[in-house]
């Protein structure tokens, strides 16, 4: 029987998570994309601790962007997560695309985070 899109994404994400681990030296930049918003977290998997987070739900971004489901919103979240990570002393991360295809909003967030100074 054919998998649904959500089930296929979840199985891809489980496969990725077996390989991608965030450490205190190089934490994991996890991206979650919903229909209306995009979320990014920098996570230390050894301590099970979220170090930095940003999303398109944040008030300053919502006022500027309006909709959180656009590539412009993803770029803004990518810049914000890079800025917050740099402030927390994080330079290098491991990218976790969350089972999503590296295209569109996920790619826009990753490119903006790279431009903001994160190395991955």
From Swiss-Prot:
* Organism annotation: Thermosynechococcus vestitus (strain NIES-2133 / IAM M-273 / BP-1)
Please give the GO cellular component terms listed in this UniProt entry. Answer: cytosolic large ribosomal subunit
Name this polypeptide is given: Large ribosomal subunit protein uL18
| Record flagged with keyword Ribosomal protein | yes
Q: Which GO terms describe its biological process?
A: translation
Q: How does it assemble?
A: Part of the 50S ribosomal subunit; part of the 5S rRNA/L5/L18/L25 subcomplex. Contacts the 5S and 23S rRNAs.
Task: Please note every region of biased composition (Basic residues).
Answer: 10-21
Q: Give the start-end ranges of region Disordered.
A: 1-25
Q: Which UniProt key words apply to this protein?
A: Ribonucleoprotein, Ribosomal protein, RNA-binding, rRNA-binding
- Entry function: This is one of the proteins that bind and probably mediate the attachment of the 5S RNA into the large ribosomal subunit, where it forms part of the central protuberance.
Quote the HAMAP family the UniProt record gives: Ribosomal_uL18_B
Q: Which residues form the signal peptide?
A: none
Q: Which family does it belong to?
A: Belongs to the universal ribosomal protein uL18 family.
């Amino acid at each position: 029987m054919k998998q649904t899109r959500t089930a296929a994404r979840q199985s891809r994400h489980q496969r990725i998570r077996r390989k991608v681990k965030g450490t205190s030296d190089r934490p994991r930049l996890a991206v979650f994309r919903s229909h209306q918003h995009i979320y990014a977290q920098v996570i230390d998997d050894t301590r099970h601790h979220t170090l930095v987070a940003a999303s398109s739900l944040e008030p300053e971004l919502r006022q500027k962007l309006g909709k959180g489901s656009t590539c412009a919103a993803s770029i803004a979240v990518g810049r914000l997560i890079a800025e917050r990570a740099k402030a927390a002393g994080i330079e290098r991360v491991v990218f976790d695309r969350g089972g999503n295809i590296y295209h569109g909003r996920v790619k826009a967030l990753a490119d903006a985070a790279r431009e903001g100074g994160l190395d991955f």
